[in-house]
C-alpha cells in the first residue's frame, strides 16, 4: 500500500512543489522531511497575505485620519466658540451666521490675530519717553546688534556653541556711554541675548535691551522698525552688519563689515573715534553723515582714509604759515584734528 506525502510551501510566490507518491519512509528520510517542514514554517512567519495587508493598512490610515479629524474639530471648537460672561455667550459679528459657519469664521479671525501678533512688535513704543530735566538724557541713541558686531558665535565639537568677544568691546561701550544712549536691538531670542549681555556688560553701559519680540517679521526676515523706538530719528544711529535689517530707515544705518572672529580686528576702536566726532561736532541730523558713508563697502576704512587726508592737508597749511604763528596753530591743530570734519 502506498502512502501519499505532500510537501511544499504556503508562500504563493514560491508555489507548491508538487506531490510525491512514495513508499514508507526510512528514518533518515523522515528526518530530512521534518527539517524541510520547519524551514518552510520559519519562512512563512513573516508572510502576510495581500488581503491581510490591506486590512492592516486600512486600520492604520483610519487611525491617522481619525486623529487628524479630531484635532481639526477640536481646533474649530476651541478657537471658534464665542466668548462668555456670567450671563452666557457674548454676541459678536458672527452670531447671526449658521452654527458651523460661526465657528469657522471665529477660528479664522483668531488665527489672523495670532499671525498679526507674531509679525508686529509687542509694543507700539519700545523705549520709554526721554527723561526730563534736571535728569541727563544723552543727545544721541546708539542702537547696536550683538551678533558679528560685538560677539561672534563659534562652534567646536569639544565645546559646542560659544560666543567670542570682539576686541575693544569694553573700551567701545565705556567711551560711547558718555554721549550716547546705548540700546541693544537684536533678532536673537531673549534666552540667548540676556545672559550674553549680562556677561558682556557688567558695568551697565547698555541702557535698554530689545530682542526678537520687538522686531517685525517681513517675508520671513526679522526687521527693525525704528518708528517704534520713541526717539528722534535725526539722532539715532544703528550699527549692524546686515543692510536689510532696517529697510524702512536705511539712512539711520551704519553697516559695518561682518566680524568673523579674528583677533587683529580694530574696527570698534575706529567706530569709537567716528562716534566721538559726531558727538563733539553736535551734528543735528546724523542721517546726512550716515548717508555719505553708506555708499562705501567698508565705511570705517573710508573714515580713516578721510582723516589721514585731512591731517595731511592741515599739516601742509601749517607749514605755509609764518614761524611765529606755527606754535599757536599746532595747539589748535591737535584740537581740530580730534574734532575734524567727519567726512
Swiss-Prot record:
Residues 1-57 are mitochondrial matrix. InterPro entries: FCP1_dom, HAD-like_sf, HAD_sf, TIM50. The keyword Flavoprotein does not apply. GO terms for biological process: mitochondrial membrane organization; mitochondrion organization; protein dephosphorylation; protein import into mitochondrial matrix. GO terms for cellular component: mitochondrial inner membrane; mitochondrion; TIM23 mitochondrial import inner membrane translocase complex. CDD domains: HAD_FCP1-like. It is found in: Mitochondrion inner membrane. One of its GO terms (molecular function) is protein serine/threonine phosphatase activity. The chain crosses the membrane at residues 58-77. Its main location: mitochondrion. It is a single-pass membrane protein. The keyword Ribosomal protein does not apply. Residues 78-343 are mitochondrial intermembrane. Exclusively expressed in the testis. It holds the Pfam family NIF. Keywords: Membrane, Mitochondrion, Mitochondrion inner membrane, Protein transport, Transit peptide, Translocation, Transmembrane, Transmembrane helix, Transport. Residues 135-278 form the FCP1 homology domain. SMART domains: CPDc. Essential component of the TIM23 complex, a complex that mediates the translocation of transit peptide-containing proteins across the mitochondrial inner membrane. PANTHER family: DULLARD PROTEIN PHOSPHATASE. Component of the TIM23 complex at least composed of Tim23, Tim17 (Tim17a1, Tim17a2 or Tim17b1) and a Tim50. Belongs to the TIM50 family. This is Mitochondrial import inner membrane translocase subunit TIM50-A. The gene is ttm3.
